[in-house]
Amino acid sequence: MIQQELIDDSEEVARIINSEWMVDGELQHAAFTLNPNETYLSVNRTSIDSYEDDVRSFVASHERFQFDKGMFYKVALLSVSDVRSIKVFIEDDQLLNINVEVEPRSTHTKSHAGIFVRYGSNNIIPSREVPEDLAQKVVSTDMILQDVRWELLELAKLQTNSL
């Protein structure tokens, strides 16, 4: 496995918002949902020099991420430090050893990054089986990811930008 540089805790990342993720002007937790077989949630690093161009280019070519007839786009800003501090508990308030990490993913654009949810070194992927010791705690991958989604929603600062 190739070791990548860590993103500094002082950075912010931005999740580009699909218009379907807004209801009555409010961001919904669906904005932070992994699709089946996805290993990470796509975000962009705001500190990278190509950030604004990367995001505008993406939004311009994907109408569902445009607001007010293509005049604006929205992003949910997240502090990397806050994302890494997310904790997952199960019903009896037992803390699970789940790590939420933000890592560079320059596969699409220079500013692209991913938010990974892991148990040990295993990525938590929607609707997949959890490791055996987690299964004994009667917890599913979907329950873990749901907790993380709600936490991300609480941490997110919505920002509107001109296209």
Task: Outline where the language-model segments fall.
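Conserved NAD+-utilizing ADP-ribose enzyme module
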Residues: M1-S10, T33-L41, R45-L163
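Signature of Gram-negative chaperone-usher
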Residues: A14-N18
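Short aromatic-glycine-(Arg/Gly/Cys) micro-motifs in beta-strand/loop hairpins
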Residues: E20-L34
